[in-house]
Amino acid sequence: MAIQEYLRRVFPGSAEDFCQKAGKALQEGDKLFVVTANPEILMKAEGNAEIRRLLLDEETAVVPDGISVVRAMQQLFLPVTERITGVDLAQRLLDMAGQAEKSVYLLGAKEEVVSALAKKLKLRYPRMEVRYKNGYGKDKDADFQEIVQAQPDLVLVALGVPAQELLIARHLDQFQKGVFIGVGGSFDVLSGSKRRAPSFFVKTNT
């Protein structure tokens, strides 16, 4: 299947527009699964039927995380506004959840990283319920059952592409609500364990 079929599914609006859409789902208790599309997951879709189905599913919200995705859409004359990075989206969603006193589950990264992020969130938003588990468990599906039991409002999974997306997809039917997003290495940045590149380099992917 041509890459352009996946690109047609990508959200065309601004980062702010998408944050409003995701924030509405968070506030109203809707279910929203977000996939941050970069060249890696688009290429993997060519050889993986599960990823292909996920990207083409009308229920999946796909955003352009990667300047090359934005440029490819422009070359194909597909509507697109700007790059929407996973780390920016994760930060906005966490802030929205904190302000609304929603519950959050963080899965992935090293213990010291994910625990530092959880502590940081609790300090900033004392009324937000934060649960977490590192990404080194041998049975990720068993780990995810803990999330199913908790039924949180926001779930961030940092296990890398495409493992994080496929894991969420396998269990999504067990949730009545929640915003779900795979965030790759974002916990390192969000926790303060790793500095992020200046905004100019993020926007231009240089």
Language-model region placement:
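N-terminal nucleotide/polyanion-binding subdomain common to many enzyme families
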Residues: 1-82
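Short glycine-rich anion-binding loops that position phosphate/pyrophosphate groups of nucleotides
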Residues: 38-41, 159-164, 186
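Structural motif
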Residues: 61, 103, 153-154, 179
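Conserved beta-alpha
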Residues: 70-151
